[in-house]
UniProtKB/Swiss-Prot annotation:
The keyword DNA-binding does not apply. Residues 39-66 are annotated as: Disordered. One of its GO terms (cellular component) is plasma membrane. This is UPF0370 protein YpfN. Residues 42-51 have a biased composition (Basic and acidic residues). Its main location: membrane. It is found in: Cell membrane. The gene is ypfN.
Length: 66
């Protein structure tokens, strides 16, 4: 078990390479053109800033400068 204490980082690298290869393999399986052709419509974005839109602090354009 002395080798495990010395070379644990190699096992981590092998694990990360395996994860990376599986991700690449899975991403190649995705057909993005088919998804984009059949993607669902998104509902309109609702934010809660709509009540603040009326409270505009910017000066009006038609007001003369003081």
């Amino acid at each position: 078990m002395d080798w495990l204490a010395k070379y644990w980082w190699i096992l981590v690298l092998v694990f990360l390479v395996g994860v990376l290869l599986n991700v690449i393999k899975d991403l190649k399986r995705i057909d993005h053109k088919k998804f984009l052709a059949n993607k669902p419509e998104l509902p309109p974005h609702r934010d809660f800033n709509d009540k603040w839109d009326d409270e505009d602090d910017w000066p009006k354009k038609d007001q003369p400068k003081k």
